[in-house]
């Protein structure tokens, strides 16, 4: 019995052990299967992630390629549009060119017909010049305006001698592009002079010289002006200015009259074919008789006009050339053309100056070089180099041995003419627009873009600075006795200065900023040029408002207005003989005028 119990117990224990082993085996197998499945799932996820990354890279590459192709396509379309636009413009330009060529041919035919009529003794009615004085309403010019008198005299719009528009993109200061310009007359049967020269059919006689008239000097009892405080800096540097002189703005229509004049029906004007003289003194005749002597046609803008010391010749500066005319006849004597410069495009002669003996003509050009020409030989006698910007102004000393130049590089240079070398360099704070020797050659005046006028001795000592203008100073001129200085500015005013450096006053007693004796107002736009008559009686100014005005040193108001150009009056010069003056303009014309006191 006991054995049976033991046997059953043993059998039960064996059964339990087998059952336990079976359970452990099953658990082990289950754990192994789960681990394997997890690994498989992880591998699948990893593979899927890698596939997605690869597809993303492929899509991004395709996107970049698509955007690049789209950009190229847009640029191709834009280029095609630009090409079509250029072709359209070329077609329009060709049509305009053909039309202008037809007009030029027609005008040449009309001109030739008129010449034949004149040669045969038949003068067309429209070519007769009006004479006498006409009393017309102030500010009125008849039916056609001051610059258009008949259909045959309508000017042709040209661009530096070629068809297609008015002169644009010129470096010369204060040149409008809105005014109509006259075409130079060029035919196969004219000489060199007639390409640039034209005179009225009937020329008034040259006025008598001023030698016999009462000499009048600048008064010393003029009311003292009140210039504003001096500019910030008195010292200067040599740093060149970044840009050449450029005058902005436009003048539309005919220039207005001075503000102080009230239009009345009984104020006399003298009206000619294309120029008018207006008295600015109410109810009085013009105090000066002005007559047009010669019209000198050019193929480009005239930047400068200058008389020789004997008054027999007039020099003009224009694009790539300086011209010398006979004042009495108006004929072109010499054409000094710049061909050696390597610079392409426009190359304007900004300033000209005769030597006192009339043998040489100095020219200041945009290529930063000064050429002293032997006029008779038509060759460059001296080439002066050293400026780093364009040259805007030149003047010879009284003895002709020294030349002074002003440049945009902020320097005034004195040159030994015989040696062709720099003698002295004077520095300013900004570009120098105008320079001039005093009549005795002891002082040099210079106007600048920094609104200041500086006076040096001929040895280079700065003795005086004149402050008062509110904008750049573009022109200066000494009085005949050298005691006064006239300045013209872009602030539309002219100022008369009493020079302390020529007086017996000690430098320590100088009034700071200078002594302004008079401020002249009346011009409606920039003052581009001023000059003083040899007897000191008249100040003559040229302006961007297209007028020339006469001023008496005694009065701040203009005495007379001359309208003789249909673009900016860039330069004015008076003859040393005192009986005539010259003007140069953006309308491609220089004119010589006579004047005489009434």
UniProtKB/Swiss-Prot annotation:
Keywords: Repeat, Repressor, Transcription, Transcription regulation, WD repeat. Gene3D superfamilies: 1.20.5.340, YVTN repeat-like/Quinoprotein amine dehydrogenase. WD repeats lie at residues 285-325, 332-371, 374-413, 415-454, 456-495, 510-549, 552-585. It comes from the Eukaryota. Residues 118-177 are annotated as: Disordered. InterPro entries: G-protein_beta_WD-40_rep, Gprotein_B, Tscrpt_rep_Tup1_N, WD40/YVTN_repeat-like_dom_sf, WD40_repeat_CS, WD40_repeat_dom_sf, WD40_rpt. One of its GO terms (molecular function) is transcription corepressor activity. Belongs to the WD repeat TUP1 family. Transcriptional repressor. This is Transcriptional repressor tup12.
């Amino acid at each position: 019995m006991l054995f049976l119990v033991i046997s059953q117990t043993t059998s039960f224990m064996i059964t339990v052990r087998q059952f336990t082993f079976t359970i452990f085996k099953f658990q082990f197998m289950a754990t192994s299967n789960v681990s394997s499945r997890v690994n498989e799932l992880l591998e699948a996820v990893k593979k899927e992630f890698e596939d997605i990354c690869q597809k993303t890279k492929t899509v991004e590459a395709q996107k970049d390629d698509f955007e690049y192709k789209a950009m190229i396509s847009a640029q191709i379309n834009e280029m095609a549009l630009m090409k079509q636009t250029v072709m359209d413009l070329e077609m329009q330009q060709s049509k305009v060119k053909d039309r202008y060529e037809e007009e030029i041919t027609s005008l040449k035919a009309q001109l030739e017909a008129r010449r034949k009529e004149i040669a045969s003794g038949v003068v067309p009615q429209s070519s007769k010049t009006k004479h006498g004085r006409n009393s017309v309403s102030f500010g009125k010019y008849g039916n056609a305006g001051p610059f258009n008198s008949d259909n045959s005299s309508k000017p042709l719009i040209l661009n530096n001698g070629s068809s297609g528009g008015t002169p644009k993109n010129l470096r010369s200061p204060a040149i409008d592009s809105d005014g109509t310009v006259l075409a130079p007359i060029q035919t196969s049967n004219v000489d060199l002079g007639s390409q640039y020269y034209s005179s009225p059919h009937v020329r008034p006689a040259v006025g008598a010289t001023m030698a016999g008239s009462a000499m009048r000097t600048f008064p010393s009892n003029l009311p003292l002006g009140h210039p504003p405080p001096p500019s910030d800096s008195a010292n200067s540097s040599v740093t060149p200015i970044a840009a050449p002189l450029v005058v902005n703005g436009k003048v539309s229509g005919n220039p207005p009259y001075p503000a102080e004049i009230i239009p009345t029906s009984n104020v006399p004007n003298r009206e000619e074919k294309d120029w008018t003289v207006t008295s600015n003194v109410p109810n009085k005749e013009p105090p000066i008789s002005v007559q047009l002597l010669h019209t000198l046609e050019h193929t480009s803008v005239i930047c400068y006009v200058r008389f020789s010391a004997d008054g027999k010749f007039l020099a003009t500066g224009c694009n790539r050339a300086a011209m010398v005319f006979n004042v009495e006849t108006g004929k072109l004597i010499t054409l000094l053309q710049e061909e050696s410069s390597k610079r392409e495009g426009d190359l304007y002669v900004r300033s000209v100056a005769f030597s006192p003996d009339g043998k040489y003509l100095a020219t200041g050009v945009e290529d930063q070089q000064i050429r002293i020409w032997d006029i008779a030989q038509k060759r460059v006698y001296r080439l002066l180099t050293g400026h780093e910007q364009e040259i805007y102004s030149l003047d010879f000393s009284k003895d002709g041995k020294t030349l002074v130049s002003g440049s945009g590089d902020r320097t005034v240079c004195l040159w030994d003419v015989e040696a062709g070398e720099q003698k002295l360099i004077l520095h300013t704070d900004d570009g120098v627009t105008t320079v001039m020797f005093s009549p005795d050659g002891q002082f040099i005046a210079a106007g600048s873009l920094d609104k200041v006028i500086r006076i040096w001795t001929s040895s280079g000592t700065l003795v005086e600075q004149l402050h008062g203008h509110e904008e750049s100073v573009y022109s200066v001129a000494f009085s005949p006795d050298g005691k006064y200085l006239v300045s013209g500015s872009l602030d539309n005013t002219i100022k008369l200065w009493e020079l302390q450096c020529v007086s017996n006053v000690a430098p320590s007693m100088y009034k700071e900023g200078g002594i302004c004796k008079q401020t002249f107002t009346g011009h409606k736009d920039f003052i581009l040029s001023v000059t003083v008559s040899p007897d000191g009686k008249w100040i003559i100014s040229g302006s961007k408002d297209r007028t020339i005005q006469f001023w008496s040193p005694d009065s701040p108001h203009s005495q007379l207005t001359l309208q003789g150009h249909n673009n900016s009056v860039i330069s004015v010069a008076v003859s040393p003989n005192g009986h005539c003056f010259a003007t140069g303009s953006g309308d491609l014309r220089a004119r010589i005028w006579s004047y005489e006191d009434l």
